[in-house]
Amino acid sequence: MQWTLVVPVKALARAKSRLSDTADDGLRPGLALAFAQDTVAAALACPAVADVAVVTDDARAGRELAALGAGVVADEPGGGLNAALAHGAAVVRAARPESPVAALNADLPALRPAELARVLAAATQFPRAFLPDAAGIGTTLLTVAPGQELAPAFGADSRARHRASGAVELRLDAVDSVRQDVDTGGDLRSALALGVGPRTAAVAARLLIAGQ
């Protein structure tokens, strides 16, 4: 079974404001783009993934991610993250109604295709499932079987909200790269310790990060 992934990408100029203590205003847009590029490249390299649709209104992000092989869906609702994901899921469902769909965070720069494949294989057992983030508070992946509604509830406390909505929490070991999203300098250090993709590594080399 091959999946269609929906990856939301925020306008780069407004992305990753919580990394302000690690990357200045001039570097953060490039860092956010690098996260998305490494995430999408790893996802497309996963044998369980048929295609990736990026939902964004950022012209630069759309252009760079399309160059990697992703499809680009305009963020037409303009209603925030969950609206963008619901819209993206509807678009890909219209094109591939028989395909399972997963919403994947765009800030997983250490993502490993084999670990993503393990998570998606586990998710096939359930109509709707999710993977919590490394902090145990948020969500990095939400999956739905064909014919099921995505019903994303990303944002603050999304782990609890997805669980309350009936999605099954996936409890897997050795999938750290799929759980390690990056919102803070500490998150970035954790991702670097796992081993990030080449684009993130290149941008991160320009940052002064304690302990690196």
Swiss-Prot record:
Phosphoenolpyruvate binds at T139, G155, S158. SUPFAM superfamilies: Nucleotide-diphospho-sugar transferases. Pathway: Cofactor biosynthesis; coenzyme F420 biosynthesis. It catalyses: phosphoenolpyruvate + GTP + H(+) = enolpyruvoyl-2-diphospho-5'-guanosine + diphosphate. Keywords: GTP-binding, Nucleotide-binding, Nucleotidyltransferase, Transferase. It is an enzyme of class 2 (transferase). It comes from the Bacteria. InterPro entries: CofC (IPR002835), Nucleotide-diphossugar_trans (IPR029044). Its EC number is 2.7.7.105. One of its GO terms (molecular function) is phospholactate guanylyltransferase activity. GO terms for biological process: F420-0 metabolic process. Belongs to the CofC family. Guanylyltransferase that catalyzes the activation of phosphoenolpyruvate (PEP) as enolpyruvoyl-2-diphospho-5'-guanosine, via the condensation of PEP with GTP. It is involved in the biosynthesis of coenzyme F420, a hydride carrier cofactor. This is Phosphoenolpyruvate guanylyltransferase. The lineage of its organism: Bacteria, Bacillati, Actinomycetota, Actinomycetes, Kitasatosporales.
